[in-house]
C-alpha cells in the first residue's frame, strides 16, 4: 500500500513539475516574442546597429523626500545635461549643471577605461576614477532611455520573464520583468497596439516604488527616441525631462576631452569602513562619505547619524565599546538620512529627531507605532559620566528647514550632515547658497 501511494505521489509530483516547467517555458517564450516586437517597433535593424547615442536634456526636479520641508509641495530645481554612450567600447560620459537643497553643481563623469575622470568645473578639478564601472555609471542613462533599455532587454532576454497583461488608464500592456547587470529588477510595460515601451518600474531600496514614463516618441535616424520622460517616487512626480537634441551613431571624441584648464588631482579611492577615535570615548565610524559618531556616555552610547550602514558601524563600535546604544540622533528627514532608523529600532534605542520629522522617522521604522522617539524643537542636552552632548536644531538652512547637529563643547567636536561639503582634494570650490549664511 505504501509503495502504491508513493508511486502515485511521485506521479502527481512529476506531473506538477512538468506543468510548472511548461508554464515557465511558455512565459519565457512569450517574453522573447514581446521583446522581438519591441525591438522592431523601436527601430529594428537600426536599433540593433546602434553604437553610440548622444542626448542633450533639460529637466525639472521635484525633490520628493529630499526637500527643505518634510511634506509637499516639494522643492523644484532645474538641470541641464549631456549624456553620451558608446555601447561597443563601454564608454559613458555625463556632463551637467544642477542646483537644489542649498547646493550647486557643474561637473561630469567620463568612463573610458584607464582614461576615466570625475570632473568638477566649479572647483576646477579632474580626478581619475579609481575603479571605473561602465555598467554602474551608465545604468541610470540606460534606464531612462527606451532605445537603450530595449537593446539591453534584447541582450538579456534569457533572464526575461513574461508577467502577464495589465490595463492602465484604459490602455493594455504586455508586462515583462528582467534584470540589468546591476541594480534592482525592472518591470517593463509595452503597449499591446504598437509595442512601444511606455512605462517601467522597480523597487529602489530606501525610496520604495520608482516609476518611469516615456512619452512623445520621434524617429531619429530610424530609432525611436522619446522626447519626454517622467519619473515618479511612490506615485509623486520627481522628475520631468525633455530631450533637446539626440544624435545617433555620432563620434564621441569631443565629449571625451578633459579641459586643459582643469587641475589634475589625485585619484579618489574608495573609502573603506574605518573607525577613528577623535577624542577619548568619541568615535567616527564610516566610509565613502557616510559616517556616524558614537559617544561613550558611561553606561550607554549616544549615536549621531542615520544613513545607510548603521548596523556595520555599530558592529565596529562593539569592538571597542560593548555598551547599549541608548539614543540614535537623525540629522534630518531626507530618505538617505533615515535609512538607519531600523538599525536603531533593533537596538532598542530611542530616536532623537526634529519634531517636524517625527512622522518621517516613524514611516521609516519597522513598527512606527512602537518606535521610541524624543523630539527636539530647539535644543536639548544629554549629560552623563561628566560628558555633555548638546543637540541643536540649526534650521532653517538652505538644505532643510530643520537640521540637528550634535555638539560636544568640552571636546570641541560638532557632528553635522549635508550642511556643507568639502572636496576630497584640490582647491575649495566657490561658495554655494548654504555656505555664506551664518547661524547664532
Model-derived regions, located:
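Short, hydrophobic/aromatic-rich segments at coil-to-beta transitions
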Residues: 49-56, 88-95, 169-177, 195-199, ...
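Flexible, processing/modification-adjacent segments and terminal tails
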Residues: 26-33, 110-185, 194, 204-208, ...
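Bacterial N-terminal signal peptides
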Residues: 8-16
Amino acid at each position: 500500500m505504501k509503495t502504491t501511494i508513493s508511486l502515485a505521489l511521485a506521479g502527481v509530483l512529476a506531473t506538477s513539475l512538468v506543468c510548472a516547467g511548461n508554464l515557465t517555458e511558455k512565459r519565457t517564450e512569450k517574453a522573447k516574442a514581446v521583446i522581438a516586437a519591441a525591438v522592431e517597433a523601436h527601430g529594428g535593424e537600426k536599433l540593433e546597429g546602434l553604437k553610440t547615442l548622444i542626448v542633450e536634456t533639460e529637466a525639472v526636479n521635484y525633490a520628493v523626500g529630499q526637500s527643505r520641508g518634510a511634506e509637499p509641495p516639494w522643492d523644484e530645481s532645474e538641470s541641464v545635461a549631456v549624456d553620451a554612450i558608446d555601447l561597443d567600447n563601454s564608454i559613458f560620459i555625463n556632463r551637467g549643471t544642477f542646483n537644489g537643497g542649498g547646493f550647486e553643481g557643474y561637473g561630469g563623469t567620463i568612463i573610458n577605461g584607464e582614461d576615466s575622470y570625475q570632473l568638477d568645473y566649479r572647483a576646477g578639478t579632474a580626478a581619475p576614477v579609481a575603479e571605473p564601472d561602465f555598467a554602474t555609471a551608465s545604468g541610470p542613462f540606460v534606464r531612462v532611455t527606451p532605445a537603450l533599455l530595449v537593446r539591453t532587454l534584447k541582450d538579456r532576454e534569457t533572464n526575461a520573464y513574461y508577467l502577464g497583461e495589465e490595463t492602465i488608464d484604459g490602455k493594455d500592456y504586455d508586462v515583462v520583468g528582467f534584470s540589468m547587470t546591476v541594480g534592482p529588477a525592472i518591470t517593463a510595460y509595452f503597449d499591446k497596439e504598437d509595442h512601444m515601451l511606455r512605462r517601467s518600474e522597480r523597487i529602489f531600496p530606501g525610496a520604495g516604488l520608482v516609476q518611469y514614463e516615456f512619452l512623445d516618441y520621434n524617429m531619429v535616424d530610424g530609432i525611436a527616441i522619446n522626447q519626454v520622460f517622467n519619473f515618479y517616487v511612490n506615485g509623486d512626480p520627481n522628475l520631468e525631462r525633455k530631450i533637446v537634441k539626440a544624435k545617433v551613431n555620432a563620434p564621441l571624441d569631443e565629449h571625451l576631452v578633459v579641459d586643459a584648464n582643469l587641475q589634475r588631482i589625485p585619484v579618489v579611492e574608495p573609502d573603506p569602513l574605518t573607525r577613528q577615535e577623535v577624542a577619548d570615548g568619541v568615535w567616527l565610524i564610516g566610509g565613502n562619505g557616510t559616517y556616524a559618531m558614537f559617544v561613550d556616555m558611561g553606561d550607554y552610547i549616544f549615536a549621531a547619524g542615520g544613513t545607510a550602514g548603521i548596523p556595520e558601524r555599530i558592529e565596529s563600535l562593539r569592538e571597542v565599546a560593548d555598551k547599549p546604544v541608548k539614543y540614535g540622533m537623525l540629522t534630518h528627514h531626507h530618505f538617505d538620512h533615515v535609512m538607519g532608523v531600523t538599525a536603531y529600532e533593533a537596538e532598542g534605542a530611542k530616536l532623537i529627531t526634529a519634531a517636524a520629522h517625527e512622522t518621517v522617522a516613524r514611516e521609516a521604522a519597522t513598527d512606527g507605532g512602537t518606535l521610541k522617539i524624543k523630539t527636539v524643537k530647539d535644543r536639548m542636552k544629554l549629560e552623563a559620566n561628566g560628558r555633555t552632548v548638546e543637540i541643536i536644531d540649526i534650521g532653517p538652512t538652505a538644505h532643510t528647514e530643520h537640521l540637528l547637529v550634535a555638539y560636544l563643547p568640552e571636546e570641541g567636536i560638532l557632528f553635522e550632515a549635508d550642511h556643507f561639503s568639502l572636496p576630497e582634494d584640490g582647491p575649495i570650490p566657490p561658495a554655494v547658497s548654504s555656505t555664506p549664511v551664518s547661524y547664532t
